[in-house]
Amino acid sequence: KDQLNAALKPYGLFFAPELSTSNRATVGGMINTDASGQGSCMYGKTRDHVLSLTSVFLDGTVWDSFALEEDELEEIKQQAGLIGQVHRDLDQLYTEKKSVIDAKFPPLNRCLTGYDLAHIRDESGRFNLNSILCGGEGSLGFIAEAKLNVLTIPKYSALINIQYDSFETSMRDAKALMDWGPTSIETVDSKVLNLAMGDIVWDTVRSYFPVNEGDPEIQGINLVEYTSDDEEELRAKVDRLTAHLDDVSGQPGKSFGYTVALGAGEINKIWGMRKKSVGLLGNAKGERRPIPFVEDTAVPPENLADYIMEFRAVLDNHGLAYGMFGHVDAGVLHVRPAIDMKDEAQEHLIREITDQVAALTQKYNGLLWGEHGKGVRSEYAPAFFGELYPELQRIKGWFDPNNQLNPGKIATPLLAGVELLKIDEVQTRGQLDRQIPDDTRAAYGSAVYCNG
């Protein structure tokens, strides 16, 4: 993704979905997981920027898919073979199940990735096969080519770095901050901040997080971004928010300080620190390593603070260390609890915690997978989709009747004996690491602890 945006920059353009993994994320991977990230409340997901896809299906068909007007759709429906069938059956499914789809799909910016039934037709009523291909994780066909929409790079930008004396306060304040019309709001907890303070990256951002006499210790921050092509408009937005922050500073449930960064050069220093969060957590010492398995849950932003407090209680009850950061405006926080997967007793925590967190996300009308695809976690799909899950199985069967493409992920075709993968029945790195002698593991510690 970074290479694509570097090529677009001389033309004043960019590919919008902003990922913290942008220096290694591929466009194909973004399409197959329907990736999103910072600024998604304004810019949406990858699907929103895909104009057309060229796909190769198992019967050898090569097909260009894009938004279709009604007459175009009706013409395609008349075709024989897979393409005609898929367009006929998918449109019929959407028509017959629309009320169930509307009720089942939560009102989230992230949506239910992996056969996104809610967007088979767009706001204009156009049918678009890409709604199920984007986020399909390669389970329906092979994406060979994509035509992408690109946007103009905003001329002016500002980042307001707001400090709080508790992480809960930062989350509860984020919903109110959205009323001030920012481009995005990112949050970082004290665990990640303290790790950043011990890293070389802190030298580039230290001045934006000053330690003033009499101030409480920073336990959480919200990074509020504004962008605009009009400098006066941008400054007016910043001035309105900072005036509000001055008025409420120190009040219960509010922030106690802030700084303002102006211009892409300065702002990118702070985003660089935020993007380094996973690496900072991965550099922690000891046998317990941060493990991604409940790392991208999503709930409606108004439920986020209550949900996260219960989520943290689950992790605290297991005595686990963790840090949290993410897209608080979209209701998505990333967390990787530290677990020694070489220890069989700790390995079992993956199942126990995932079951608890899955139940929590349903309690708060959210998702277990809000950003990084379903993968092995697809075993929870039937519980989330309910009566719609058999419809996903039908879709899988149209494209992949013999379960050959990324089997066990998202949905299985309606075949006897074919099941989704289960999170505790797949081989883990910890199981492999147990085979390495202790002295060898100690001698090559840097390699063993590398998280990629």
Language model regions located:
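Active-site capping/gating regions of soluble enzymes
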Residues: 48, 128, 134, 140, ...
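Terminal amphipathic helices with adjacent charged low-complexity linkers/tails
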Residues: 65-68, 72-73, 146-151, 171-288, ...
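A glycine-rich phosphate-binding loop feature that marks nucleotide/adenosyl-phosphate handling sites
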Residues: 21-28, 111-116, 120, 186-203, ...
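Accessory "access/gating" subregions that flank catalytic or transport cores
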Residues: 87-127, 186, 192, 255-261, ...
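A generic structural motif
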Residues: 150, 164-166, 226-232, 301-303, ...
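Generic non-transmembrane alpha-helical segments
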Residues: 7, 11, 173-181, 240-253, ...
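Short, hydrophobic beta-strand segments
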Residues: 157-162, 218-228, 287-297, 333-343, ...
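FAD-binding subdomain of flavoenzyme oxidoreductases
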Residues: 1-174, 402-412, 416-446
